[in-house]
């Protein structure tokens, strides 16, 4: 067993060896190294064919037309291209956007930028379960609403939003619907023929593909128009100029194909390991699961251990690679904005740990994780005066703390 045990699959996944092998064939003089846009010789044709195959593999994952797949540098760029692209193209129709407070920073910060440009954004507050009711979205819609952007699976708590129902609502109101599917593509079955999604962001490195590559699904029926953010040679039907990175794209395509083929088997195993982990630690006193218990992605477990500081717990769990939020915000000492939006107080938000399980997690690793967590929580609480007060029956919320 390799230490530390990797339980941070929501931050990134290792590249599947089958994917790495495919990528290696697109780099050197012996491989498919040409520029896919070079139409005058075989090196270019071979690269173009490799990209076409990968485009079909990514399209197959979500049941899209390959012409609806635009390759980007990752889900962050896809989110930016979708939201800014729609806002700038349809600005004469309206300048109002609806999103939620628990979206990824790539969506929230893009919306903040649009606010600086004169757009208006409504940030919806989810229920304590993390779910956003469709009625709440409907109530926020206005005559000038042009876009709704709601993620399918939350990166911190793993809850699954009902994008089918939200899509129906948006389509009936003729409002464009964007879904950030970075955490769900390759893990949940997605069918854009039945789910009324207009734009969908996908990440390569969240599904055992390489970093630095992503895709944006752009619907053709109904046709969605975007204003490009990257200008140049007119690649990707003018939506995203720049020489296509064949090896990255081939890697993402192969990762998508494997994810589609292995999804059911992978998910059953991952869900079993997640349940094993939760059943192993849920009996620890004052331990709470964050987010809806039923509607959640199979690999995700966000747990608050009351009276334990998250940072000190992470240091105590040195044999486990876990996080106290998303990788994009864990550098800040602020409590998770996602957990705060669910109504957790600062103390509970600070005492939470995100465990995310994936394709290469083993039973042995989960057993070791359970023992490590139990031991660490016990040790930290023994040192905690707050835990002692709580055990003595003192209501900590009623205590008047002196400020020195």
UniProtKB/Swiss-Prot annotation:
Annotated GO biological process: [2Fe-2S] cluster assembly
Domain of life: Bacteria
Residues involved in pyridoxal 5'-phosphate binding: 75-76, 155, 183, 203-205, 243
Pathway of action: Cofactor biosynthesis; iron-sulfur cluster biosynthesis
Residues with N6-(pyridoxal phosphate)lysine modification: 206
Keywords in alphabetical order: 2Fe-2S, Cytoplasm, Iron, Iron-sulfur, Metal-binding, Pyridoxal phosphate, Transferase
Cofactors demanded by this protein: pyridoxal 5'-phosphate
Catalytic reactions of this protein: (sulfur carrier)-H + L-cysteine = (sulfur carrier)-SH + L-alanine
Gene Ontology, cellular component aspect: L-cysteine desulfurase complex
EC number: 2.8.1.7
Active site: 328
InterPro entries membership: Aminotrans_V_dom, Aminotrans_V_PyrdxlP_BS, Cys_deSase_IscS, Cysteine_dSase, PyrdxlP-dep_Trfase, PyrdxlP-dep_Trfase_major, PyrdxlP-dep_Trfase_small
Name of one Pfam family that matches: Aminotran_5
GO MF, one example: pyridoxal phosphate binding
Enzyme class: transferase
PROSITE patterns assigned to the protein according to its UniProt record, in alphabetical order: AA_TRANSFER_CLASS_5
Compartment(s) where it occurs, according to its Swiss-Prot or TrEMBL record: Cytoplasm
Residues binding [2Fe-2S] cluster: 328
Description of how the protein assembles with itself and partners: Homodimer. Forms a heterotetramer with IscU, interacts with other sulfur acceptors.
Sequence similarity: Belongs to the class-V pyridoxal-phosphate-dependent aminotransferase family. NifS/IscS subfamily.
Biological role stated in the UniProt entry: Master enzyme that delivers sulfur to a number of partners involved in Fe-S cluster assembly, tRNA modification or cofactor biosynthesis. Catalyzes the removal of elemental sulfur atoms from cysteine to produce alanine. Functions as a sulfur delivery protein for Fe-S cluster synthesis onto IscU, an Fe-S scaffold assembly protein, as well as other S acceptor proteins.
PANTHER family attached to this UniProt entry: CYSTEINE DESULFURASE (PTHR11601:SF34), CYSTEINE DESULFURYLASE FAMILY MEMBER (PTHR11601)
Protein name, per record: Cysteine desulfurase IscS
The organism of origin for this protein: Shewanella halifaxensis (strain HAW-EB4)
